[in-house]
C-alpha cells in the first residue's frame, strides 16, 4: 500500500462527517482537499447534502469517500444521518467552510487513545489571518475568542469553548443519549454537549486540535434564532452559566459598553434604556453559552436598543405632538371664549 492511500480493508477508526448545503463549493473543495492530506489514514469521509456537487465529482473518486443525500432542513438532521451511516467508532464533524491541518485526525485519535473514558473532544477554530479584517465579526472574535483558546478545559467548563465545526464524539454516545436535536437551526451542537455533560460523560477542549474557519459574516448572524430561543433561554441553560460566568460576562459587558455610549447621546429615556441594556446585554451571556457569541453578542443588544430608541423616540415625539395639538386646541378654545366674553353686548 502506498503511503497516501487509505486502508480500505479495515473498518475506519474515524468517520469524518461533512454536512453541506452545496452553496460554498470553493470552501467545500478546500475542506475535502485538507482532509485528503491527513497523515492519519484509517478514516472515511462522509459528505451529506441535499444534492450531489457535480462540479467536485473528481474529488469523490476514492473508496474512502461517500456521498449521502439527505433532504432535512437543518444541520442537525444532516449530521444525524451521517452518524447513522458512519462505520467508525469515532465521528468527527467539520464545517464545509473549514480546513484541517494535516495532523488534525492524528491528534484526535491519539487523544482518544490516551483518555479512554473521553466521549467528546473539541478544539478552537481560527479565522485565517488574511481574512481577519474582512468583517468586524471576524476581527472581534479573533481578539476575544482566540485569547481563550490557549488552555485545556474539561467537562462542563469545556462546553462554551467547543464549536460544532471542530468536534469529535464516540459514536456510541448517540445510542446512549439520543441524537442531535433536529428542530434547532443553531445551537444544536451545544444542546447535545449539554446533554452529554448532564449524563456524566467526559468532554475535553484541547487547544492543540484546531482548524481554520472561513467565517461568513453578518449575513448569517441571525439565522434560526426564533426556533433556538426557547432552548438558550431555558432554566437548564441558565443553571450552566455558573460554569463559565466570567467568560460570558466579559462579552456581555462589552455589549453594554457600546449600548451605553449610544443611549447617552440619543435618547432622553436614559434609565429605561439602561434597563434594556442590562436585559439584552445579559442575553449575551446566553449567546456565549450557546456558541453563537461570534455572530450575535456584539450586535444583538445594539440592534435591539437602537430599535427601542427609535420606538421610544417615535412615541415621545407622538406624545409631544399630540400634547402640542391639544394645547393649541385648548388655547384656541380659551381664546375664543375670552374674546366672546370681552365683546360689548
Model regions and ranges:
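N-proximal low-complexity "stem/linker" segments adjacent to membrane-targeting elements
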Residues: 1-34
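Short, acidic, metal-binding catalytic loop of nucleotide-sugar glycosyltransferases
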Residues: 33-42
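Glycine-rich, basic loop-to-helix element that forms the pyrophosphate-binding segment
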Residues: 70-86
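Short aromatic/hydrophobic "clamp" motif used to bind/position activated sugar donors
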Residues: 91
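Conserved donor NDP-sugar-binding/catalytic core segment of glycosyltransferases
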Residues: 103-136
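Short, flexible, basic/aromatic active-site loop/helix in glycosyltransferases
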Residues: 123-124, 141-159
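A recurrent flexible, glycine/aromatic-enriched loop bordering the glycosyltransferase active site
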Residues: 150-169, 185, 220, 242-243
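Catalytic donor/gating beta->alpha subdomain of glycosyltransferases that bind UDP-sugars
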Residues: 181-185, 190-241
Amino acid at each position: 500500500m502506498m503511503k497516501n492511500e487509505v486502508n480500505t480493508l479495515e473498518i475506519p477508526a474515524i468517520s469524518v462527517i461533512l454536512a453541506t448545503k452545496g452553496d460554498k463549493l470553493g470552501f467545500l473543495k478546500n475542506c475535502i482537499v485538507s482532509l485528503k492530506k491527513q497523515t492519519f489514514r484509517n478514516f472515511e469521509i462522509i459528505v451529506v447534502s441535499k444534492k450531489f456537487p457535480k462540479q467536485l465529482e473528481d474529488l469523490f473518486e476514492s473508496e474512502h469517500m461517500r456521498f449521502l443525500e439527505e433532504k432535512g432542513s437543518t444541520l442537525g438532521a444532516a449530521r444525524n444521518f451521517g452518524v447513522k451511516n458512519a462505520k467508525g467508532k469515532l465521528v468527527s464533524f467539520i464545517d464545509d467552510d473549514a480546513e484541517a491541518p494535516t495532523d488534525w485526525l492524528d491528534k484526535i485519535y491519539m487523544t482518544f487513545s490516551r483518555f479512554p473514558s473521553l466521549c467528546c473532544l473539541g478544539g478552537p477554530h481560527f479565522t485565517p489571518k488574511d481574512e481577519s479584517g474582512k468583517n468586524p465579526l471576524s476581527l472581534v472574535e479573533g481578539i476575544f475568542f482566540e485569547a481563550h483558546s490557549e488552555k485545556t478545559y474539561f467537562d462542563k467548563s469545556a462546553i462554551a469553548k467547543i464549536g460544532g465545526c471542530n468536534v469529535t464524539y464516540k459514536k456510541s454516545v448517540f445510542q446512549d443519549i439520543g441524537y442531535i436535536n433536529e428542530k434547532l437551526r443553531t445551537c444544536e451542537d451545544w444542546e447535545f454537549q449539554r446533554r452529554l455533560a448532564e449524563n456524566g460523560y467526559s468532554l475535553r477542549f484541547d487547544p492543540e486540535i484546531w482548524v481554520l474557519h472561513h467565517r461568513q459574516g453578518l449575513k448569517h448572524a441571525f439565522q434560526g434564532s426564533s426556533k433556538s430561543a426557547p432552548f438558550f433561554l431555558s432554566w437548564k441553560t441558565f443553571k450552566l452559566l455558573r460554569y463559565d460566568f466570567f467568560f460570558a460576562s466579559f462579552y456581555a459587558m462589552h455589549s453594554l459598553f457600546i449600548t451605553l455610549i449610544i443611549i447617552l447621546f440619543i435618547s432622553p429615556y436614559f434609565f429605561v434604556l439602561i434597563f434594556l441594556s442590562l436585559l439584552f446585554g445579559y442575553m449575551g451571556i446566553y449567546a456565549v453559552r450557546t456558541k453563537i457569541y461570534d455572530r450575535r453578542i456584539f450586535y444583538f443588544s445594539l440592534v435591539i436598543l437602537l430599535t427601542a430608541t427609535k420606538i421610544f423616540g417615535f412615541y415621545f415625539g407622538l406624545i409631544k405632538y399630540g400634547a402640542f395639538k391639544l394645547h393649541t386646541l385648548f388655547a384656541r378654545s380659551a381664546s375664543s371664549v375670552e374674546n366672546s366674553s370681552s365683546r360689548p353686548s
